[in-house]
């Protein structure tokens, strides 16, 4: 009987299985192949329709292959989708509406549109949150607190995101937090 209680106690102390990251039916899935591994992302088409349509158009246009994760801040974000390996900025379509008011939060593993201080300046660049970043959430209507529009989440490959988030960085061509060895986006494909 005491062995039963010992085993029961050990079972109760065991960590719970990881929460399932199953995508919602109908949400688009995109696979990002990088020089460090593959990241699979679910896109929130209902909560962020403008951002998702914009991102998917860049995917369908073949815009992202050859771009790099040009900004890596450990414990914060990895950002990419706008510069080539030599840090040449790619030409983009016009900026889109900022959907930061959609109620989605910048939690670990979420994907959001990058922008400048101008509220409607997001084009092709996006970032993945390495940790919860409430300072990036919408809390008001001035540029400092308007927030960054979350439009998806990583459902596979967060280990790859974390490895990218741990690369050595420095300054290059007037930009900070640039990986010393380029981390290249090799392909981005729409899975569904």
Spell out what each predicted region is:
Residues 1-9:
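Sec-dependent signal peptide recognition
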Residues 8-192:
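Cyclophilin-like peptidyl-prolyl cis-trans isomerases
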């Amino acid at each position: 009987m005491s062995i039963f209680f010992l085993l029961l106690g050990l079972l109760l102390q065991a960590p719970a299985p990881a929460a399932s990251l199953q995508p919602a039916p109908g949400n688009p899935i995109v696979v990002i192949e990088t020089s460090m591994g593959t990241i699979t992302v679910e896109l929130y088409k209902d909560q962020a329709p403008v951002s998702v349509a914009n991102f998917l158009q860049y995917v369908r246009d073949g815009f992202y292959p050859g771009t790099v994760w040009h900004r890596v801040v450990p414990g914060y974000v990895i950002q990419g989708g706008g510069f080539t390996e030599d840090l040449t900025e790619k030409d983009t379509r016009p900026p889109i509406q900022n959907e930061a008011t959609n109620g989605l939060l910048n939690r670990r593993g979420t994907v959001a549109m990058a922008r400048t201080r101008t509220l409607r300046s997001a084009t092709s660049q996006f970032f993945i949150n390495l940790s919860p970043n409430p300072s990036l959430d919408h809390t008001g209507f001035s540029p400092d607190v308007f927030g960054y529009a979350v439009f998806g989440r990583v459902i596979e490959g967060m280990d790859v995101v974390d490895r990218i988030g741990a690369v050595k960085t420095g300054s290059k061509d007037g930009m900070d937090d640039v990986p010393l060895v380029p981390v290249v986006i090799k392909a981005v494909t729409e899975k569904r």
